[in-house]
A protein has these predicted regions:
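Conserved phosphate- and dinucleotide-binding cores of soluble alpha/beta proteins
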Residues: 2-108
């Protein structure tokens, strides 16, 4: 996501969480509004694999596209590992495939 979330694990979530119920941020709800008739129909909560669960996977795939994702992709892949950028934890996974279009990769 634009803020580095993965699987609805928003900034400042703890890395050890397992699958859990999350309250969606307004940014996440607005990003998904295009899939609904109005913002009122966008769910306020979701089930998410926690980062702890995600990190136990044998292989991971990270996909991003567009210039709007360029900065957060750079932060996640080359910045410090921090709960402020949840996707940054993927730096510690032994088998992550990253697929980016030219725009998303433009700051790397």
């Amino acid at each position: 996501g634009h803020n580095g979330h993965i699987g609805f694990n928003e900034p400042d979530d703890v890395f050890e969480k397992q699958t859990h119920r999350v309250e969606l941020t307004e940014m996440t709800r607005e990003a998904n509004n295009r899939l609904f008739n109005s913002i009122d129909e966008v769910p306020t909560h979701a089930r998410s694999m926690g980062i702890g669960t995600i990190m136990r996977a044998r292989k991971l795939l990270l996909v991003a596209n567009g210039t709007a994702k360029a900065q957060i992709v750079r932060d996640a892949l080359t910045g410090p590992v921090t709960p402020r950028v949840p996707a940054s934890i993927l730096q510690f996974h032994p088998d992550v495939t990253v697929v980016l279009d030219k725009d998303a990769a433009s700051l790397l």
